[in-house]
Design a protein with these regions (language model features):
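Active-site scaffold of zinc-dependent metalloenzymes
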Residues: 159-183, 225-234, 251
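Acidic helix-start/capping segments at beta-turn-to-alpha-helix junctions
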Residues: 102-107, 135-154
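Catalytic zinc-binding patch centered on the HExxH motif and its immediate surroundings
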Residues: 114, 146-171
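Bacterial N-terminal signal peptides that target proteins for export
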Residues: 1-9
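Disordered inhibitory propeptide/activation segment of secreted metzincin zinc metalloprotease zymogens
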Residues: 24-113
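A short alpha-helix/helix-coil micro-patch that ends at or immediately precedes a cysteine
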Residues: 108-136
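The catalytic-center signature of Zn2+-dependent metalloproteases
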Residues: 184-185, 189-244
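C-terminal motif of bacterial Sec signal peptides marking the signal peptidase cleavage site
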Residues: 16-20
């Protein structure tokens, strides 16, 4: 009798284990489908912002446009109410009035050797007149932006995410070894530029680079050769925010 009870108990445990494994397998199977569905939404959102399909690069867990703008496939897609936004210097999705007052930046250990450059880039955005936009470095979670080193290959100095859901873009990748030989001012410029993407700015020189069409931030007109947000100018571009960069920041924030 005792042996029979033990046999039944073992059988029950095996059945439970099989059911548990099957349930876990079903959960795992569902997750990729949800990821694919959200990736499709993100892809459509990018197109709605005005980026042509041929400019969108699938890079595994994210989409990349204009070489240094990131859209994670798992991002929360903002609700677009006005149809395609085909012409703009910014995405139309900005950091909200509460979050802009304290955008918390966490420096990954891989980037601590460039802390001074990061602080320099932050100081430029924090110093814009008539703007309440503020970045602050924090040493632990919670944080809004993670800045880390990543090998992005030759020709790409950094990448940054656009804002989503009222929060700043959550990630900046810096190709640290690639820009290490640049001057301090140019390294800080790269980092400052990527912070600009995190608060919604696109490349000021989009037309010259053949990127998707854009219009000015309201009240800030014309091209700007001095803009720090010009793309394709790693190690050669402006190292300080131009007057128009500052005017655009004040207009949005």
């Amino acid at each position: 009798m005792k042996k029979l009870i033990q046999t039944i108990a073992v059988a029950a445990m095996m059945a439970l284990a099989i059911v548990s494994c099957k349930k876990n397998q079903e959960t795992i199977a569902d997750e990729p489908q949800e990821t694919v569905k959200n990736a499709d939404k993100v892809l459509q959102y990018i197109k709605d912002l005005g980026f042509p399909a041929e400019s969108i690069v699938d890079n595994g867990n994210e989409f990349v446009v204009e070489e240094d703008i990131l859209f994670p496939k798992n991002m929360v897609v903002p609700f677009v109410t006005e149809g395609p936004k085909t012409e703009q210097y910014y995405t139309g999705s900005i950091v909200n009035s509460t979050n802009k007052l304290n955008i918390r930046v966490f420096i990954d250990p891989s980037m601590t050797s460039m802390t001074s450059e990061i602080n320099s880039g932050i100081a430029q955005w924090n110093g814009v007149p008539n703007s309440t936009l503020r970045f602050n470095v924090v040493t632990a979670a919670p944080y809004d932006i993670l800045i880390k080193d990543e090998n992005l290959g030759s020709g790409t100095c950094g990448q940054g995410q656009f804002p989503s859901g009222g929060s700043a873009g959550a990630l900046i990748k810096i190709n640290k070894s690639y820009i290490a030989g640049n001057s301090f001012a140019q390294r800080a410029r790269t980092i400052c530029h990527e912070f600009g993407h995190c608060i919604s700015f696109r490349h000021t020189n989009w037309a010259a680079r053949g990127e998707s069409t854009a219009t000015n931030v309201p009240g800030v007109t014309g091209t700007d050769a001095s803009s720090l947000m010009n793309g394709g100018q790693c190690n050669s571009g402006a190292t300080v925010l131009s007057t128009k960069d500052k005017d655009a920041t004040a207009a949005l924030y």
